[in-house]
Amino acid sequence: MMPVYMDPSQPCQMRPQEYYYQGFGNNSQHMAMDAPPPCHGSCVHGNFPAYWPPCYPPQVPYHQCCMNRSAFHPPHASYAPSCYVHPPFPVGYQPWFDVEKDVPGKHHCGKCSSQMCDLKKDRGVVIEEHEPEIEKGEAVLPVRSTNCPYPIIWIPHENARNQEYRSSLGLGKHNQPPAEVRAPDNMTIQKSFPESWRGCFPFDESSMKSLVQNQDSKKAQNGKTVEAPFDISKFKSLLQGQDMKEAQIQKNKEELGQLTYPTSWVPSRRKRDDVEASESSNEDRKKMQNGKTVEYPFDISMIKSLIQGQDVKEAQNQKNKEEPGQVPYPIFWIPSYGKRKDVEASESKESSNEGRNLESCPSDLHRNEGQITQAKGKEGNFECNVLSDAEEKSSVINIPVANHLQEPRNIPVKLSENHLPKPTEPTKRIAKNEPVKSTKKEQSSSSSEASKLPPVCLRVDPLPKERNGGSKSVSHPKRMEKSKETKIAAPLSSKKAESRTVPEACNVKCEDANAEMKMAEGSLNALRTEKGSVESNSNLQEESNGEIIKPCEAKENREQPAKKSFTEEEAARIIQSMYRGYDVRRWEPIKKLKEIATVREQMGDVKKRIEALEASTDQHIEEKEIVVNGELVMNLLLKLDAVEGLHPSIREFRKALATELSSIQDKLDSLKNSCASAEKEAVKEQVEIKSQPSDSPVNLEHSQLTEENKMVSDTNLEKVLRLSPEEHPMSVLNRTDEKQAESAAETEEGYGLFETLATDSKQATENAAAASSTTIPEKIGEVETVVPGNPPSADGNGMTVTNVEENKAMVVESLEEPINELPQMVEETETNSIRDPENASEVSEAETNSSENENRKGEDDIVLHSEKNVELSELPVGVIDEETQPLSQDPSSSYTREGNMTAMDPKTASQEETEVDHSPNNSKGIGQQTSEPQDEKEQSPETEVIVKEQPLETEVILNEQAPEPEITEPGISKETKKLMEENQRFKETMETLVKAGREQLEVISKLTSRVKSLEKKLSHKKKTQIRRRASKPMSVSPTDAVL
């Protein structure tokens, strides 16, 4: 026969567990063997392992699963071979998964799957094996093995009571158990192994009964508890075929409230006579041994009740009554969960009785209660006048506190004479079986406690927690305070105070109710709400104060006004007014008006600051304040723009504020312009102050010469204008080729430079300042070279005088017109500086030539000057006039004049003195000879520097050099030093002014860029706001559709 683990038809390919086959004699080796797995008929585990001999003959036909009787045994089991004998039926077996579904046909072994056991069904569910969750007290046996499907059961042998067994444990004999738990006298010592070790289950019931009777399943030896490892009552129930689950449930119900720890019970007041009965009940089933509480895991009385059918509880109570003196000290008992309600009810009744007694009995009786009860106890009378429960309810009123979890407080109230209850017959109380001494002690202890504390009904409870209308308590907080005041004010010994406090509270409540009714007459809504409150208040007063508040109720009922009914028109008006109010509130006009008011206040502050700016004189501070105020105005405009959704009446206010702010902005712009003009004027004033000359004869002569030159220039302008354009080509042909080229180049450069350099004013000032210091000496030198050649030409020719006068007039005109245009022509200075040596060579040639050549040169010069003047006069007049007007006022020509004087040598000065002293013809000759260099000096860098600030006094530089030789040589040296110093100062001031102008330009450019950025932001915000407004109805529509 194939072994089990090699058979492919068997799903479990594991070896079966080893188990013991029934042997012969007193062989106890089976205690170390495991039981075999059970078989229920559907699975056959009859194949033996390979190392055992094959089963011949085949398996015995009968099987324990197929038998109906639980106590079936094979005949002559002891004489049958071990391979043919089946294991006995497991007595303590229960199904693996569920106890209630104990059907033999539906169960299979734990090692087989459900698919093999139930082949008829097409579907099979594989159940995962796991440990069942067994509640406490529902286990079949106390020990459960997870590896083996059956529990391990151990029954204590009879040798457990043996003295030797106790001595082996090392226990002495000095601690003996009490008489009621000692072992029976007929117990004998067995040296051999007990019979319970032999044979298999089931045992005889008689032997089990004797075992249970002789051994109480637990025994206290030498002051310690010996516990049995299993519950015999449960085991007995299995033998008798009872349902252990129902028995366990019944046992739990019976043992409800049984505590597993030592407890103590202090009896309540008026319940001390029941202490003895509670001691005799002994519901917790604890044994007191040598001053220690012994606790057992199972109930011995239940086993006896199952076997003998006796009520162990009654027997134990009778035994305790018969032997009352065995317990050396009293047992204190705490009532179980089910009995606590009765105790609390009794305590509440006692407290109510005390509250009623307070009305009829003085406080001295309560204080001396112990003495009175002792005296009555001696006489044997325990009688007292007690009211019934109905009378207690009528006499004592329970007022609930806001906190429902607390117990109700009992407040005594004195009733009228008509409503006092009639005294009833005294009721007898249960007398105690204890002696009078014990009662005296107990009553004395109660009297001492009563003397320390006041009665329960007059104790003041802590203030209840206030609740915001969530509680269902009927009492109002104000009324609760009034009632508390009455409680505190009431003394313990007087009745009058108690009778007065409650009516006062009633009057206060009535007055409060009347005041509320008067306030309710104001509006319709208040009337409706106050109706409910009045009704609730009346109910409150009825419940709290009983019949005393009836007159207050009558007053309230009289003062209630009739309900007002509205017509349709009145109701429509009310509804419309309410809706209009809601519609106005929806606009939020107050909030937006407040925002506009804040903007208006800030605007007033800005106005004050602007007025202060107008009054101030500091230019630097003004510029900064103007910028700050401009930003403030822009912020206020933004705030006004942010106020949206205005009512039409409010929009007008916003428009007015916006116009005021725009006017303020215009004022700030005008202040900016005025500040700029003021800066220019201040710069001019500073220059004038620094350029004022000292009072000297030289300065006076210069002033006189400037006036004369102005007059000459005015008279000679007409002559130049009368020149016809036909004379120009004739004069050009008579000139030499070199002069024609020079004149043509000069005119072309004049036009081109005027157009290209019209925008570069800054570079012109810098180059002019640099060139002025270098070019002055060269030009003065040129004048010196021209002077010595004049006398011979002047003496011999009469034509030269007229030519010289004409040349002077032409020089004046030529200096007036181009000087106005030269501030923007900086590059022309370089070309003129290159031409200076050519002019010098021409002057030297003029000295060597004869008088005839000189006359020709004079005529040619006049023609050239006329050409230049005509060409320059054709330029736009507006450009020239704009620059000449501010510059003509500058009196700084003295600096240029003095600068020219510094470069002159003392030798040239002496030569000029000699030439000027001869005759006036020399002066005319000087003018005639210097006509050409003067034409070139008009475009030189020296004239450019002077043109920017003093255009009219450049004429003086050329014509004022005649009177200078009057000064002596030592005087010239000192003045030249002063002039040099003043020239340097002038240069420094010019540089500082140029830098300041640049800084101002930068600031202006930054401000303009900032203003542009702010304008862009404003435009962008307005666009986004418009888009958001347009998108609102789109966002609302889908939600409305969904709703």
Swiss-Prot record:
<feature type="region of interest" description="Disordered">
    <location>
        <begin position="311"/>
        <end position="331"/>
    </location>
</feature>
<feature type="compositionally biased region" description="Basic and acidic residues">
    <location>
        <begin position="478"/>
        <end position="487"/>
    </location>
</feature>
<dbReference type="GO" id="GO:0006914">
    <property type="term" value="P:autophagy"/>
</dbReference>
<feature type="coiled-coil region">
    <location>
        <begin position="971"/>
        <end position="1024"/>
    </location>
</feature>
<comment type="subunit">
    <text>Binds to the ATPase domain of HSP70/HSC70 chaperones. Interacts with calmodulins CAM1, CAM2, CAM3, CAM4, CAM6 and CAM7. Interacts with BAGP1 and APCB1.</text>
</comment>
<dbReference type="GO" id="GO:0051087">
    <property type="term" value="F:protein-folding chaperone binding"/>
</dbReference>
<dbReference type="GO" id="GO:0050832">
    <property type="term" value="P:defense response to fungus"/>
</dbReference>
<feature type="compositionally biased region" description="Basic and acidic residues">
    <location>
        <begin position="550"/>
        <end position="566"/>
    </location>
</feature>
<keyword id="KW-0346">Stress response</keyword>
<feature type="region of interest" description="Disordered">
    <location>
        <begin position="817"/>
        <end position="975"/>
    </location>
</feature>
<feature type="compositionally biased region" description="Low complexity">
    <location>
        <begin position="840"/>
        <end position="852"/>
    </location>
</feature>
<feature type="region of interest" description="Disordered">
    <location>
        <begin position="764"/>
        <end position="799"/>
    </location>
</feature>
<dbReference type="GO" id="GO:0009506">
    <property type="term" value="C:plasmodesma"/>
</dbReference>
<feature type="compositionally biased region" description="Basic residues">
    <location>
        <begin position="1018"/>
        <end position="1031"/>
    </location>
</feature>
<feature type="compositionally biased region" description="Basic and acidic residues">
    <location>
        <begin position="724"/>
        <end position="741"/>
    </location>
</feature>
<feature type="compositionally biased region" description="Polar residues">
    <location>
        <begin position="885"/>
        <end position="899"/>
    </location>
</feature>
<feature type="region of interest" description="Disordered">
    <location>
        <begin position="533"/>
        <end position="566"/>
    </location>
</feature>
<feature type="compositionally biased region" description="Polar residues">
    <location>
        <begin position="1034"/>
        <end position="1043"/>
    </location>
</feature>
<dbReference type="InterPro" id="IPR040400">
    <property type="entry name" value="BAG5/6/7/8"/>
</dbReference>
<dbReference type="GO" id="GO:0010508">
    <property type="term" value="P:positive regulation of autophagy"/>
</dbReference>
<keyword id="KW-0112">Calmodulin-binding</keyword>
<feature type="compositionally biased region" description="Polar residues">
    <location>
        <begin position="534"/>
        <end position="543"/>
    </location>
</feature>
<feature type="compositionally biased region" description="Basic and acidic residues">
    <location>
        <begin position="934"/>
        <end position="951"/>
    </location>
</feature>
<keyword id="KW-0175">Coiled coil</keyword>
<keyword id="KW-0143">Chaperone</keyword>
<dbReference type="InterPro" id="IPR003103">
    <property type="entry name" value="BAG_domain"/>
</dbReference>
<feature type="region of interest" description="Disordered">
    <location>
        <begin position="410"/>
        <end position="500"/>
    </location>
</feature>
<feature type="compositionally biased region" description="Basic and acidic residues">
    <location>
        <begin position="853"/>
        <end position="871"/>
    </location>
</feature>
<feature type="region of interest" description="Disordered">
    <location>
        <begin position="724"/>
        <end position="749"/>
    </location>
</feature>
<feature type="domain" description="BAG">
    <location>
        <begin position="595"/>
        <end position="672"/>
    </location>
</feature>
<feature type="domain" description="IQ">
    <location>
        <begin position="568"/>
        <end position="597"/>
    </location>
</feature>
<dbReference type="InterPro" id="IPR036533">
    <property type="entry name" value="BAG_dom_sf"/>
</dbReference>
<feature type="region of interest" description="Disordered">
    <location>
        <begin position="1015"/>
        <end position="1043"/>
    </location>
</feature>
<feature type="region of interest" description="Disordered">
    <location>
        <begin position="343"/>
        <end position="366"/>
    </location>
</feature>
<feature type="compositionally biased region" description="Basic and acidic residues">
    <location>
        <begin position="343"/>
        <end position="357"/>
    </location>
</feature>
<feature type="compositionally biased region" description="Polar residues">
    <location>
        <begin position="919"/>
        <end position="932"/>
    </location>
</feature>
<dbReference type="GO" id="GO:0010228">
    <property type="term" value="P:vegetative to reproductive phase transition of meristem"/>
</dbReference>
<dbReference type="GO" id="GO:0009408">
    <property type="term" value="P:response to heat"/>
</dbReference>
<dbReference type="GO" id="GO:0012502">
    <property type="term" value="P:induction of programmed cell death"/>
</dbReference>
<feature type="compositionally biased region" description="Basic and acidic residues">
    <location>
        <begin position="311"/>
        <end position="324"/>
    </location>
</feature>
<protein>
    <recommendedName>
        <fullName>BAG family molecular chaperone regulator 6</fullName>
    </recommendedName>
</protein>
<dbReference type="GO" id="GO:0005516">
    <property type="term" value="F:calmodulin binding"/>
</dbReference>
